[in-house]
Amino acid sequence: AQYGYDEINLNCGCPSERVQKGSFGACLMLEPKLVAECFQAIREASGLETTIKHRIGVDHQDDYPFVQNFVGTLYEAGCRTFIVHVRTAFLKGLSPRQNRDVPPLKPDYAYQLKKDFPQAQFCINGGILTLEESKTFIDNGLDGVMVGRAAYHEPWMLSRVDEVLFGEEPHEIRRKEVVEQMTAYLH
């Protein structure tokens, strides 16, 4: 909190070997009670809202009850905001890059989590390429959307968020301005 952060996100979704060796990332989904303890310790020590980003499964443990149990354990520990990357993380056999493309997207899991835990907020992540897609997810009951690579490759798309998602008047901005504003965050 002393550094001006609004929240802390515990990422339980990264499948890289380097991250696994440190017992971080997606492999943590195999230990939901440990993640719940970490969540509570982080929230208590920081005093900040703490969120969890996770996949829908790990390796061949990717049926809905697996992710439902993971989220349920965290929900019981007090977590109320989940960012759901709607792909399974394969810890062996796929590179991090392949893990972003090869496992199929299962957005129905995010919708079902929202139904099962209606008091929690669920943001969907994974394979979202346009603001129009984002709006569809929100219009259909999810609380938010996390856009990754699409925003990285086309940062100027973010200039239309208020227009597309919230119906505000279009705000014209040149790509050069977007890059200049984004550069301030890269240093």
How would you describe each model-predicted region?
Residues A1-F24, P32-A120:
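Alpha/beta enzyme core
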Residues E37-Q40, A45-G47, V58-H60, Y64-G72, ...:
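Alpha/beta catalytic cores of nucleotide-metabolism and tRNA/nucleoside-modifying enzymes
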Residues C27, E31, N99-V102, N125-G127, ...:
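Glycine- and other small-residue-rich loops at beta-strand/loop junctions that grip anionic moieties
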